[in-house]
C-alpha cells in the first residue's frame, strides 16, 4: 500500500476548490489521506459548532467507494451522524448542495456534507470535497484549517485518528441511508419553467 510522505509537497493534503484531489499510484490520494482529512474535518465541525448531519455522496470514480468506507469509519467513531445514499448510489454535486440546504431549513443543528469526487479529473484520481452548511463549497478560511490539521495528523502517524472496524459501519446508530435524488428531481419543476423548454421546440442530439 502506498503511503504519503509529508516531506514531499505533492503527497501532502492540499485543498484546491473546496477539496483535496490526487492519485493513489502517486501517493497523493490514498487511505491515509482520507483518514487524516476526515479526522481533521470532525475536529473542525466540533470547533465550529456544526453538530448536525453529515451528508456523504460519491461519484463513479473507482476510488470514491473505498474512500467513502474509510471516511465513514472515522465519522462514525467520532459519533458524527451521517447520511449516505441508499444502495451506494451516486450523488451529483448539485444534489448534495440541494440536500444540505433543504436539511437546514427546519433543523436546530447545522448540517453539512462531503462529496467524494475529483470532479473532471482522470479516472485514476480521487477527491474529497467539503460543503459547508450553506450548501456551497468551503472557502479557504475553512479549508486552510482542515488542510493544516490533516497534515499534522499525517506527520504524527495518524495517532489522533479515531475509527471503527469496516464490518461495524452498517451496524452504527450514527448511520442512516437516504434517497438524495428524488427530492431534488421533484423540486426541479418549482425552479425551472418546464413549459418554456417544452414550447421552445429545441432539438437536442446526444
Predicted regions and their residues:
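Glycine-rich phosphate/diphosphate-binding loops that line cofactor/substrate pockets in enzymes
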Residues: 38-54, 193-200
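Short glycine-rich or small-residue beta-strand-to-loop segments that form or flank ligand, phosphate
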Residues: 23-24, 53-59, 203-206
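Short, highly selective alpha-helical patches that border small-molecule cofactor pockets
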Residues: 34, 38, 64, 68-72, ...
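Cofactor-/ligand-binding subdomain signature composed of acidic, glycine-rich
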Residues: 1-32, 36, 152-156
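Phosphate/oxyanion-binding active-site loops and adjacent basic polyanion-contact surfaces
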Residues: 29-39, 63, 88-92, 177-187
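Short, glycine-/Ser/Thr-/acidic-enriched flexible segments
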Residues: 20-22, 61, 89, 119-121, ...
